[in-house]
């Protein structure tokens, strides 16, 4: 399987040895509830993870938790609580969201930055030893002029790049593009290291964790398009400094989520928290909405678009339930000895095309209706199994089983009354089944 690499602008094999995949997706800074824009990358890479596992790859998936940051320090001060108490609370909230949106986590690890300070110290020291960094008044800065590879990820030249974070003291730095690996501070959470008392820079945390858990180069690095520069750029150049190679073979960037064609921001009062969205719409609707557009393109969030996605998916599930009802009535429903046909994944294995898999499912629903009309129950049973598997196991749609003993009894009674031509009574059962969305 090949996936498009946004740096080389070519399709690349997802695994060099055809067996193992190492994947890293930048996680949240846990100082607040995540917003709906944060859901798009993790849902996107959840589907990719599920796909790889289905194809038989051994996938190691790392998704970090940034629990050390100036934002956390400032928020904790506002709320008059400790930084770790604050970050722990929002970390728990984030994991609740992941559970709600049905993220497959059995092969994932979620390392916290605060648990890896010694690793970060050693990683920074390697960069210093290799003469890619310098110390100024207890701060450690990466010298971006030491490599002609800086700008490779964002496709920018050094003299075109923006200056570093506003929080950094540019007067201390040799070059305005240089960034902090370690920041000297006694304010907020800090550690006493050989450099100074302080805390790590954001860009160093991710590259260090990748090296610790996944080695000197990974197969896929993912995240939102907003992280391409400076975060991914700075991650990559550190790996070049330490390991003399790019951090990842494939870089995947998920497009922006706009709200009513505007960038989401608090100033525009269009900032929507994930927990608020999920209190109004279920997980299936939210996931299906994200599948409507190629993961790398911008996606426009509107209530109308969300409702359209909801209706589309509900129609698909409704039809699948109708097909199952008829299979049960005809005593043709049987999932035993059936195996998922991986040819159904062709739209996903073809450069991970999410909108095409949506179209594929809709076309198969139409074809299933033809099979039902023609009473080709054997083929209908196979297709029903494959579509249900694709929706639940690969696309992460939560299955709700409507076929309890009562429902099956209603179906059989309705069918028996029809055969007996007792139409007045059968219509009563038909109405009950329609209310349950089984007919």
Swiss-Prot record:
Its EC number is 6.1.1.16. It is found in: Cytoplasm. One of its GO terms (cellular component) is cytosol. Monomer. It is an enzyme of class 6 (ligase). It comes from Malacoplasma penetrans (strain HF-2). Binds 1 zinc ion per subunit. One of its GO terms (molecular function) is zinc ion binding. GO terms for biological process: cysteinyl-tRNA aminoacylation. A motif ('KMSKS' region) lies at residues 263-267. Keywords: Aminoacyl-tRNA synthetase, ATP-binding, Cytoplasm, Ligase, Metal-binding, Nucleotide-binding, Protein biosynthesis, Zinc. Signal peptide: none annotated. Zn(2+) binds at residues 26, 206, 231, 235. Belongs to the class-I aminoacyl-tRNA synthetase family. This is Cysteine--tRNA ligase. Its cofactor is Zn(2+). CDD domains: CysRS_core (cd00672). The keyword Transcription does not apply. ATP binds at residue 266. The gene is cysS. It holds the Pfam family tRNA-synt_1e. A motif ('HIGH' region) lies at residues 28-38. InterPro entries: Cys-tRNA-ligase, Cys-tRNA/MSH_ligase, Rossmann-like_a/b/a_fold, tRNA-synt_1_cat_dom, tRNAsynth_Ia_anticodon-bd. It catalyses: tRNA(Cys) + L-cysteine + ATP = L-cysteinyl-tRNA(Cys) + AMP + diphosphate.
């Amino acid at each position: 399987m090949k996936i498009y690499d946004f740096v080389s602008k070519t399709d690349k094999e997802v695994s060099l040895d055809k067996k193992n995949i190492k994947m890293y997706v930048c996680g949240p800074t846990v100082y607040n509830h995540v917003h709906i824009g944060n859901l798009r990358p993790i849902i996107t890479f959840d589907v990719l993870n599920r796909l790889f596992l289905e194809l038989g790859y051994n996938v190691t998936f790392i998704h970090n938790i940034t629990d050390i940051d100036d934002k956390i320090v400032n928020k904790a001060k506002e709320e008059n609580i400790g930084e770790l108490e604050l970050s722990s609370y929002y970390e728990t909230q984030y994991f609740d969201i992941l559970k709600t949106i049905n993220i497959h986590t059995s092969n994932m690890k979620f390392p916290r930055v605060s648990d890896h300070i010694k690793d970060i110290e050693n990683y920074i020291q390697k960069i210093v030893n290799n003469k890619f960094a310098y110390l100024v008044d207890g701060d450690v800065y990466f010298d971006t002029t030491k490599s002609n590879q800086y700008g490779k990820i964002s496709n920018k030249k050094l003299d075109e790049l923006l200056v570093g974070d506003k929080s950094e003291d540019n007067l201390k730095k040799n070059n305005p593009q240089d960034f902090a690996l370690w920041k000297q501070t006694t304010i907020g959470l800090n550690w006493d290291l050989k450099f100074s008392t302080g805390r790590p820079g954001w860009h160093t945390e991710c590259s260090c964790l990748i090296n610790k858990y996944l080695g000197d180069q990974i197969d896929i690095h993912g995240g939102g398009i907003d992280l391409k520069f400076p975060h991914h750029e700075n991650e990559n150049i550190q790996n070049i400094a330490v390991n003399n190679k790019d951090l990842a073979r494939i870089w995947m960037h998920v497009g922006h989520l706009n709200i009513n064609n505007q960038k989401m921001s608090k100033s525009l009062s269009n900032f929507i928290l994930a927990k608020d969205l999920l209190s109004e719409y279920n997980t299936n609707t939210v996931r299906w909405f994200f599948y409507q557009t190629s993961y790398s393109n911008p996606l426009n969030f509107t209530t109308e678009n969300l409702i359209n996605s909801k209706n589309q998916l509900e129609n698909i599930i409704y039809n699948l339930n109708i097909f199952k009802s008829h299979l049960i009535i005809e005593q043709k429903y049987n999932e035993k000895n059936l195996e998922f046909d991986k040819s159904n994944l062709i739209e996903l294995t073809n450069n991970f095309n999410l909108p095409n898999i949506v179209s594929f499912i809709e076309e198969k629903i139409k074809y299933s209706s033809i099979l039902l009309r023609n009473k080709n129950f054997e083929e209908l049973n196979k297709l029903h199994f494959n579509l249900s598997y694709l929706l639940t196991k690969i696309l992460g749609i939560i299955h709700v089983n409507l076929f309890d003993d009562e429902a099956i009894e209603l179906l059989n009674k309705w069918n028996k009354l029809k055969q007996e031509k007792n139409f007045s009574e059968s219509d009563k059962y038909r109405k009950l089944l329609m209310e349950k969305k089984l007919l």
